[in-house]
């Protein structure tokens, strides 16, 4: 056999309590005490369930109830009792005078539980969560990591700059891809060197041409005069007193003159 209902559902009010119902319940409890909650509604003239009357009295109408927010000492006591008793809110409320089990349960779920999670503590086991106090994943780099990354970037910057310069530097800077016929480019230094070489070669070429010209006109130059000998000396076979350019040697030959 099951337990009989405490009241008739057909004649029972449901919903929010009115001010008149609260006054009747308070007056009856003050006059007769709490007594039996199953018979209290009929004796007090209330069309309410016995359970509803009990919860209304305990949670809202008791004169010793504390009003206001929980204090820091109460928070610490609730955490300690919860670590020992778990979710047995009635036993926890018995050790907190002026607080109800329903009030403590609501306060635990809305405030203390979130506070423990924010501190890195598991609200069920009351032990620190693996991974430290931070329960949320942060994508911001730590200061030490940021400094190390900046130093590494600064160290790699010159190397990357050198590699970029080496890649961008042309392998053949003087290469001309224009398809046209033009004289080769000559530098000023090359021109000066060529002029010096021409100055060294020119006397020999002129001397050779002069020898050929002398033979062509029948005025040959003897070997002795060609080697620097004196004109008209012994062994000189120059004809008509002309040198290799066709001029008279007596006019251009100053070697016979004595310096005074």
From Swiss-Prot:
Mainly expressed in the aerial parts and, to a lower extent, in roots. Residues 9-61, 62-116 form the HTH myb-type domain. GO terms for cellular component: nucleus. Keywords: DNA-binding, Nucleus, Repeat, Repressor, Transcription, Transcription regulation. GO terms for molecular function: cis-regulatory region sequence-specific DNA binding; DNA-binding transcription factor activity; sequence-specific DNA binding; transcription cis-regulatory region binding. Induction: By wounding. Triggered by MYB69 to repress lignin biosynthesis. It comes from the Eukaryota. SMART domains: SANT. It is found in: Nucleus. Residues 37-61, 89-112 bind DNA. Its main location: nucleus. CDD domains: SANT (cd00167). GO terms for biological process: negative regulation of DNA-templated transcription; regulation of DNA-templated transcription; regulation of lignin biosynthetic process. Transcription factor that negatively regulates the expression of caffeic acid O-methyl-transferase genes (COMTs) and of other genes involved in the biosynthesis of lignin, thus preventing lignification. PANTHER family: F14D16.11-RELATED. This is Myb transcription factor 42. It comes from Zea mays (Maize). The lineage of its organism: Eukaryota, Viridiplantae, Streptophyta, Embryophyta, Tracheophyta.
């Amino acid at each position: 056999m099951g337990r009989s209902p405490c009241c008739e559902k057909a004649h029972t009010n449901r919903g929010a309590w009115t001010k008149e119902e609260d006054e009747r319940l308070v007056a009856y409890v003050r006059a007769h005490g709490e007594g039996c909650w199953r018979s209290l509604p009929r004796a007090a003239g209330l069309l309410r369930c016995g359970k509803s009357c009990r919860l209304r009295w305990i949670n809202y109408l008791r004169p010793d109830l504390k009003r206001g927010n929980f204090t820091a000492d109460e928070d610490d006591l609730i955490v300690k009792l919860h670590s020992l008793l778990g979710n047995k809110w009635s036993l926890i409320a018995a050790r907190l005078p002026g607080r109800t089990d329903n009030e403590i349960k609501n306060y635990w779920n809305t405030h203390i539980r979130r506070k423990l999670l924010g501190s890195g503590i598991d609200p069920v086991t009351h032990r620190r969560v693996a991974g430290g106090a931070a329960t949320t994943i942060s994508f911001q780099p730590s200061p030490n990591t940021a400094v190390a990354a900046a130093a590494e970037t600064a160290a790699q910057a010159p190397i990357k700059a050198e590699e970029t310069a080496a890649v961008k530097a042309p392998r053949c800077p003087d290469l001309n891809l224009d398809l046209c016929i033009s004289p080769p480019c000559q530098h000023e230094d090359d021109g000066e060197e060529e002029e010096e070489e021409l100055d060294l070669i020119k006397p020999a070429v002129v001397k050779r041409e002069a020898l050929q010209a002398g033979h062509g006109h029948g005025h040959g130059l003897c070997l002795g005069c060609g080697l620097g000998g004196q004109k008209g000396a012994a062994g000189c076979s120059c004809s008509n007193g002309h040198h290799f350019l066709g001029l008279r040697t007596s006019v251009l030959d100053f070697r016979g003159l004595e310096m005074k």
